[in-house]
Amino acid sequence: MASKIFFVLAVFLVMSAVLPESFAGCKKLNSYCTRQHRECCHGLVCRRPDYGIGRGILWKCTRARKG
């Protein structure tokens, strides 16, 4: 019985570490995204960072610019 509970808990922890955005329903600030604006949370847009490691390859949810 204890081994089943441990297994379920381990699977949940792995899934929550691998797919944190899927549990939240939308992707939060600085989460990786796939160029679709609607997958990021309200007020965020998906764009390529122009700095840092992997720039131009990995897209992230960032704050929408005002103006």
UniProtKB/Swiss-Prot annotation:
Source organism: Metridium senile (Brown sea anemone)
Keyword Secreted in annotation: yes
Modification Lysine amide, positions: 66
Classification of source organism: Eukaryota, Metazoa, Cnidaria, Anthozoa, Hexacorallia
Role this protein plays: Alpha-toxins act on postsynaptic membranes, they bind to the nicotinic acetylcholine receptors (nAChR) and thus inhibit them. This toxin shows inhibition against mouse alpha-1-beta-1-delta-epsilon (CHRNA1-CHRNB1-CHRND-CHRNE) (IC(50)=1215 nM), rat alpha-3-beta-4/CHRNA3-CHRNB4 (IC(50)=5.173 uM), rat alpha-7/CHRNA7 (IC(50)=4.786 uM), human alpha-7/CHRNA7 (IC(50)=8.869 uM), and rat alpha-9-alpha-10/CHRNA9-CHRNA10 (IC(50)=202 nM). Also competes with alpha-bungarotoxin for binding to orthosteric sites on muscle-type T.carlifornicus (IC(50)=256 nM) and human alpha-7/CHRNA7 nAChRs (IC(50)=19.81 uM).
Keywords: Acetylcholine receptor inhibiting toxin, Amidation, Disulfide bond, Knottin, Nematocyst, Neurotoxin, Postsynaptic neurotoxin, Secreted, Signal, Toxin
Cysteines paired by S-S bonds: 26-41, 33-46, 40-61
Record-given protein name: Alpha-actitoxin-Ms11a-3
Signal peptide: 1-24
GO MF entry, a single one: acetylcholine receptor inhibitor activity
Subcellular location: Secreted; Nematocyst
